[in-house]
Amino acid sequence: MRLNGEISSGEEEEEEKQTGTTTFSSQKVVVGYALTSKKKKSFLQPSFTGLARNRGINFVAIDLNKPLPEQGPFDIILHKLSGEVWREIIEDYREKHPEVTVLDPPDAIQHLHNRQSMLQDVLDLNLSDCHGKVGVPRQLVITKEKDPSSIPYEVTKAGMKLPLVAKPLVVDGTAKSHELFLAYDEFSLSAVEPPLVLQEFVNHGGLLFKIYIVGETIKVVRRFSLPNISKRELSKVAGVFRFPRVSCAAASADDADLDPNIAEHPPRPLLERLARELRHRLGLHLFNIDMIREYGTKDVFYVIDINYFPGYGKMPGYEHVFTDFLLSLVESKCSNKKLAA
């Protein structure tokens, strides 16, 4: 059985050799993982696996060529593979092995694969009493059935304001699904292939806040983003422009000399409430939120994307945060067993 983002048996054997060393903890926690090779490299860095091993955590690669129930036993399973086959495997395992913590439930993850549904939970929130306002840019969904030539008409009919950000509707883990286009006029959108989500562009000072969630822990990292667009520029420029993934590690803004009005982090009470509500509504432990502050305001924020199991390797101090989180899951489960006994 080979799945999207498969792990080779050689990688599995090497990982088992690396995780077979003695730990300094009396209690060992076994974390099975099913990750793409790229994800494994960025997430399971030596600094992380070494710290985790010293605190009693062993990472073991799941062999995708063998039935999952025949492997383990596991305390926790970490996974991020695409495809219906894997989804069915992990869902079946989760139902039959409730003693194992699966991060995260497949159905909950699926919710974030659609950019329309992922932001609906933010729209449903009421955070008016939390030192700020959080919303979602006005958006329009263009389904696969739509003729691209009809997009300008749909935009005009919906009363969307230019410029518009166009993103693929489906997030499937590929680089293509994270591309975005910036359209200065509605007619140029005929060149972009549906299905799409069109969002009104909100000027935000060229800065984006990546809010990493690991259980109850919140970490904020600033990233450079698309610059403000003036009315003058909008009147002179036409066309649609393609951008790669905007918020990458190389575009870190944490050490830059920025205008304090732009660079100031969102209020902590607001982030804590937002993270808590989304954890509950999404049913996820591991995700990040891409948030912007409307330029010229202090407390008006927009969520523009939510990603499952993001690139935690880019989050400062992720090794300690993740190690503490994994141990807390096991400790919580042990405590619940004692209370039930």
Swiss-Prot record:
Q: Per its UniProt record, what Gene3D superfamilies does this chain match?
A: 3.30.1490.220, 3.40.50.11370
As recorded in UniProt, coiled-coil segments are: none
Q: Where does ATP bind?
A: 115, 167, 178, 199, 202, 225, 304-305, 307
Q: Which domain of life is it from?
A: Eukaryota
- Please give the Pfam families that the UniProt record associates with this protein: Ins134_P3_kin, Ins134_P3_kin_N
The entry marks the following residues as binding 1D-myo-inositol 6-phosphate, namely 38, 80, 173, 178, 210, 212, 288, 307, 311, 314
Subunit relationships: Monomer.
Q: Which family does it belong to?
A: Belongs to the ITPK1 family.
Which named protein is this?
A: Inositol-tetrakisphosphate 1-kinase 4
